Amino acid sequence: MDDTKKRIHKYIEKHDLIRSDDKLLVAVSGGPDSFALLHFLWSANLVPKEAIAVAHLNHHLRENAEKEQLAVQTFCEERDIPFFIEEVDVKKRAEKLQKGIEETARIVRYDFFEKVMAENNINKLVLAHHADDQIETILMRLVRGSSSIGWSGIQPKREVRGGYAIRPFLPITKAEIIEYATKHALPYEIDESNTSQEYTRNRYRTQLLPFLSKENPAVYEHFKRFSEETSEDFQFLEELASNLLKKNLIQNGKQSTLLLSDFKNEANPLQRRAIHLLLMYLYNDDGRVITVNHIYQIIQMIQSENPSSSIDLPKKLTVIRSYNELHFQFGERHAPPEFYHQLELNDRIELDNKASIRLKLKSSVVQTNGLNGMLLDAEDITLPLIVRNRVNGDRMTMKGQAGSKKLKDIFIDAKIPRQERDNLPVITDYTGKILWVPGVKKSAYDREFSRSKKQYIIRYTRNIGGNESMHNDIQKVLISEDELQEKIRELGRELTAEYEGRNPLVVGVLKGATPFMTDLLKRIDTYLEMDFMDVSSYGNGTVSSGEVKIIKDLNASVEGRDVLIIEDIIDSGRTLSYLVDLIKYRKAKSVKLVTLLDKPAGRNVAIEADYVGFVVPNEFVVGYGLDYAERYRNLPYIGILKPEIYSE
């Protein structure tokens, strides 16, 4: 075996590119690189010959395209190699897609390859990129200003639909490939466009590469090592960045929101890598769209003292900084819709944000529900009321303050995101006096209840969630889905060891523990029985009522049984304390408690779990079974609910 073949075999083994049970689809254009690749694979016995197939796409871009197609077809027919040929007029397709010819050619090429792989149960696409391509790619990316991940160049293996694209020729040069193809008399065609100085890559190939090779003949090996070491570094950093995104990224349809409270405290290299990873996801792994400048612009937004800013990126991606959130969304920016409603006594109006506003005459002692209800003295205002957008120059008279304050400054003080301010309802009386911005601020016209005065009450009701995503109501992802499952696997192992051979009765506490219990039981590898109780002291609020009620009792007897209680969270502890005492009273042999979450700061009674998943801070947490007003149970993670949601 000559040195060239040895290096190829060593490279394949090092990067685990080809296994004996793989099925290979070799992309053959008709040039020396791909013909040499096909011949090498055909003769190397890495896989059975019947596991090799060929794909050729005729782009109809070159004069010798028909000769190339015929050469590929003839070569395959002579050796009984299955081949797939497709013809596409790339110029017409590019006009239709409104993309460049090179980008369009790449799209149709990979669509064709992946289609053939899927239809023929092929798991590896083999491409003929070589060491010259590697150097050209790295240099082009550095000069163009690509993000640092691009510095590692062409990777030996990457995922495609249905399998992997592999590049076993990366360790050898173009000259070695030509020598191989000539030695074996392969019928390749030379692409006449390869000498045109019109293309950037050709200028690098004909001008820079000869210079570098002359300066140091070992340049190919040096760039290969640079690529591999850089790739290893970035893979390590990417794993850290991926975990960082899992904790701080909320995805909602067309919008992705990065929570900045913790993210902005991470080291700059990790922030940059996470932003690059997110952009790669948003751009469907098309790294050519992303430059270093894009990433640095976003990092500057994150680190800026300005809480509200935005930038526009390629392909209509807008990045919006809104205090401690960074929103990524595709599409044109639209001006917010203007609205103007008159609100008569006993009327109710529905707003586009799925909220409603009602005006009634006060009839009894009224509590105005925080920021979402308001009492007005009839003598202070003129009906009908007006509900509208804000306008330039809006000012509100404030309680306990002389003069008035700009609405813009009120929004800034309340940290209302800039993109949301134009959508907030502003309530005035008929003369134009601003009375209230629901959920934000009340004016000096807000009154206490009076039996002697005629008063009106305005109610602002928000339909929590509405058509919007529930993810938008989350202030911070506290525990990611992956972290939950990792902890559940750990608890499952501990409980398997604890209860092996004891056939415990596992009691799930409805409703919150259901997702946790479902996943946990899959990880307990021993015989058990399960039952459920619904014992509550909450209701629809955020604070325990203190009264414990049995809504659903057990069907099974606990007498003489080892009982394991599964709960979603221990907060005040009243419910669980009552339940443990009850089961002990019913003569259970043993009672142990496993809880996903423990909130020690909320404890009112002395109770501790035997097994704890996570200790959480004294915040209102929802998701993965935990709710507020019966919502958010189906979130796949544990998140902290925004205070404005449960203070409404």
UniProtKB/Swiss-Prot annotation:
One of its GO terms (molecular function) is tRNA(Ile)-lysidine synthase activity. Its cofactor is Mg(2+). It comes from the Bacteria. It is found in: Cytoplasm. Keywords: ATP-binding, Cytoplasm, Glycosyltransferase, Ligase, Magnesium, Metal-binding, Nucleotide-binding, Transferase, tRNA processing. The keyword Ligase applies. Its main location: cytoplasm. It catalyses: IMP + diphosphate = hypoxanthine + 5-phospho-alpha-D-ribose 1-diphosphate; GMP + diphosphate = guanine + 5-phospho-alpha-D-ribose 1-diphosphate; cytidine(34) in tRNA(Ile2) + L-lysine + ATP = lysidine(34) in tRNA(Ile2) + AMP + diphosphate + H(+). Ligates lysine onto the cytidine present at position 34 of the AUA codon-specific tRNA(Ile) that contains the anticodon CAU, in an ATP-dependent manner. Cytidine is converted to lysidine, thus changing the amino acid specificity of the tRNA from methionine to isoleucine. The N-terminal region contains the highly conserved SGGXDS motif, predicted to be a P-loop motif involved in ATP binding. In the N-terminal section; belongs to the tRNA(Ile)-lysidine synthase family. In the C-terminal section; belongs to the purine/pyrimidine phosphoribosyltransferase family. This is Bifunctional protein TilS/HprT. It comes from Listeria innocua serovar 6a (strain ATCC BAA-680 / CLIP 11262).
